[in-house]
Amino acid sequence: ENRKVFLNRTLMKVLFLFFWQAKNKYTMSARILIVEDHADLRHLIRMMLEFDGYEIYEASDASEGLEMVHRVRPHLLVLDIMLPGGMNGLDLCRLLKTNPALGLPAVVLVTARGKPRDIEAGLAAGADAYLVKPFNSMKLLEIVKRLCEKSAH
């Protein structure tokens, strides 16, 4: 009886992994760059997106993010606005959206700045979506999926 339960559980795990991979097959080729200076949040976002099958890259400031854009050509950036160094997230977003040579990736701004004028500034800089911290993780996943599907067509 115990062996039967063990085999059933093993079979369920194998089936889950098979269907999970099939469900996420379209996302496997989507490259996402997370530009966030807080390592814990960057890691959390990475885990969420990797679980959904995305290929993830990370940067801790806008300069490193720009370097990674040149190197990996991401389909989408999850980008904080308030970053250390000379360039902030809005500057990087503007640069990405006005320079077709960089591939015109989709940009999701994820920031603590939630005033209407901040949101307007983010969208004016070219962001495709704007989320205020603390954000709903399911909402981020929905936005990322929608934007990745849109860029695939």
PLM segments and residue spans:
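Short amphipathic alpha-helix used as the core "switch/output" element in two-component signaling
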Residues: 67, 90-103
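Acidic catalytic/metal-coordinating carboxylates
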Residues: 61-64, 87-91
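Two-component/phosphorelay signaling modules centered on CheY-like receiver
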Residues: 39-57
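Conserved acidic carboxylate
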Residues: 36
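Short hydrophobic/Thr-rich beta-strand motif most characteristic of the beta2 strand and flanking loop
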Residues: 53-62, 68
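Active-site beta3 strand of CheY-like receiver
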Residues: 72-78, 83
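Alpha4 helix (beta4-alpha4-beta5 surface) of REC/receiver domains from two-component response regulators
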Residues: 43-46, 91, 114-131, 138, ...
